[in-house]
């Protein structure tokens, strides 16, 4: 008897999107009908978290199943340093990545979208079909240089539409070869949420969709002292005149309704793209043989806690829910029951092990030092043991999050930059407003959580990339001044 064909996998990832930016997660102003429908046809995870709230580290963790202190990518890989990278440099080359494992198992593999893990001109990590943009971050959604299997050209239209078109074409081609399973990685470069990409009115077919929306789903909080501290810090270390970003935008965007509506419209454009991908699967007869996963690289504050952006949008880095809580929806008609939700604490990094177990490939790689856990039984509706905990890290900040507590430990090895810890009681303070760290009444729980956090990083952090012990970051770090103060000017 012939071996049963393994299911296809489509893994869709957005760029800078909190779970809160979807209708199915409770945002009444967001128009996301296709993703809401996808959630109704599958399972929605309400407590999914990324391990790091920056683009490159979180993507590396999904591809490798490892934390940043293991794979060495601690922040976004700076496009301005690309000419300093070795030819063909791949930030996760030494690891057995998800596409490489599936390729060995007979899968056709495609990556269509934002890569941001190294050199872009040629395919990496066992990818057969390679389509990406010529830079990691998005300055404009239009007029981007694209690379299609080694050939480069400028695409005048919207990059999200381009990636959708290419994904649909790929699925149509795979439908002609239904006996060969495929992996399609589709990391969109939207909705993004930063100037200049969302400054002004959106120039696409959903550009006017939110013209009459009051945007009450975006908090109007005062700018936090931590956001201002980052702005002041970066005026010295990463000023615009030195080629760095204009951090004043982080203070201005929450009060610019046009930009907010632009950002929301970019998400609706992606929602439409996801719908086209799902339609292509159905049209090609692949719907019942494909597991589709939708998630984001990391969360994004829309003004919550007085800042706009990701985990490193404040000084010190924050570990609040809004910056780490991501959407996670999984649909596989006939294999995963419809209209389900899960409250389990899971990580996007866990997708590595989950996909492998779901496909029956868990034994095809060495998992000894892989902290990613498999929640595949949850997809099947099975009963299984699960520890509701996720671990997070953002250079100088590390955290453990349980159903009851969020504890943030900060690096203490710098005399010039003293940092304090955070502790939040999530039952009494779900919005994470009252810091209990240092309160004698909570000293025991703080010690317990600190012990668990330290044990986790003692077990998994690679000394080469453990910043807290003098290790380095691949390509670049976001807080070099801190690490030079701690470890010396040659760090």
State the predicted function of each range.
Residues 14, 24-29, 43-67, 74, ...:
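Short, solvent-exposed turn/loop segments enriched in Gly/Ser/Thr/Pro and often Arg
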Residues 123-126, 133, 194-201, 279-336, ...:
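Histidine-centered active-site microenvironments of extracellular/periplasmic hydrolases
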Residues 63, 136-153, 275-279, 283, ...:
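Substrate-binding rim/cap in mid-to-C-terminal beta-strand-loop elements of soluble/periplasmic
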Residues 1-7, 14, 18-19, 44, ...:
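Long, internal low-complexity/basic segments
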Residues 123, 128-129, 134-137, 300-311, ...:
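C-terminal cap/loop subdomain of S1 sulfatases and analogous C-terminal strand-loop tails that border
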Residues 5-20, 37-39, 62, 102, ...:
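Beta-strand elements within well-structured catalytic alpha/beta cores of enzymes
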Residues 74-104, 108, 116-260, 264, ...:
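Formylglycine-dependent
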Residues 7, 11-14, 18-110, 135-138, ...:
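Active-site segment of extracytoplasmic enzymes that catalyze sulfate/phosphate-ester chemistry
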């Amino acid at each position: 008897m012939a071996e049963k064909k393994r299911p296809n996998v489509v893994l869709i990832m957005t760029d800078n999107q909190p779970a809160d930016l979807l209708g199915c997660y409770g945002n009444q102003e967001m128009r996301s009908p296709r993703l809401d429908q996808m959630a109704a046809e599958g399972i929605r995870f309400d407590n999914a978290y990324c391990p790091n709230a920056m683009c490159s580290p979180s993507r590396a963790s999904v591809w490798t199943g490892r934390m940043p202190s293991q794979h060495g990518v601690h922040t976004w890989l700076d496009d301005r340093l690309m000419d300093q990278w070795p030819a063909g440099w791949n930030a996760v080359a030494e690891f057995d990545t998800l596409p490489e494992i599936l390729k060995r198992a007979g899968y056709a593999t495609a990556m269509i979208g934002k890569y941001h893990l190294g050199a872009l001109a040629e395919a990496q990590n066992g990818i057969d079909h390679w389509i990406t943009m010529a830079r990691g971050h998005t300055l404009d959604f239009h007029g981007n240089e694209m690379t299609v299997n080694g050939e480069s050209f400028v695409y005048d239209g919207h990059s999200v539409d381009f990636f959708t078109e290419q994904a649909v074409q790929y699925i149509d081609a795979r439908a002609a070869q239904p006996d060969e399973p495929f992996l399609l990685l589709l990391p969109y470069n939207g909705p993004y949420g930063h100037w200049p990409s969302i400054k002004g009115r959106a120039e696409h077919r959903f550009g006017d969709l939110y013209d009459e929306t009051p945007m009450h789903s975006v908090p109007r909080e005062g700018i936090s002292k931590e956001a201002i501290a980052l702005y002041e810090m970066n005026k010295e270390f990463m000023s615009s005149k030195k080629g760095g970003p204009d951090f004043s935008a982080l203070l201005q965007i929450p009060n610019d309704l046009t930009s907010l509506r632009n950002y929301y419209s970019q998400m609706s454009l992606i929602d439409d793209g996801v719908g086209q991908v799902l339609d292509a699967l159905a049209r090609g007869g692949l719907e019942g043989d494909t597991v589709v996963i939708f998630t984001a690289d990391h969360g994004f504050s829309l003004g919550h806690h007085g800042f706009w952006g990701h985990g490193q949008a404040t000084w010190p880095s924050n570990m609040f829910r809004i910056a780490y809580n991501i959407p996670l929806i999984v649909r596989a008609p006939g294999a995963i029951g419809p209209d389900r939700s899960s409250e389990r604490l899971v990580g996007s990094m866990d997708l590595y092990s989950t996909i492998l177990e779901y496909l029956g490939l868990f034994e095809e790689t060495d998992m000894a030092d892989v902290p990613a856990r498999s929640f595949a039984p949850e997809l099947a509706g099975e009963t299984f043991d699960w520890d509701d905990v996720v671990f997070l890290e953002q250079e100088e900040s590390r955290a453990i999050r349980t159903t009851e507590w969020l504890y943030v430990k900060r690096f203490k090895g710098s005399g010039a930059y003293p940092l304090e810890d955070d502790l939040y009681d999530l039952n009494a303070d779900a919005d994470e407003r009252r810091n209990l760290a240092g309160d004698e009444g909570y000293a025991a729980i703080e010690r317990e959580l600190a012990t668990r956090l330290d044990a986790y990083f003692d077990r998994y952090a690679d000394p080469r990339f453990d910043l807290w012990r003098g290790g380095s970051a691949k390509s670049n770090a976001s807080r070099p001044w801190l690490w030079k103060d701690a470890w010396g000017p040659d760090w």
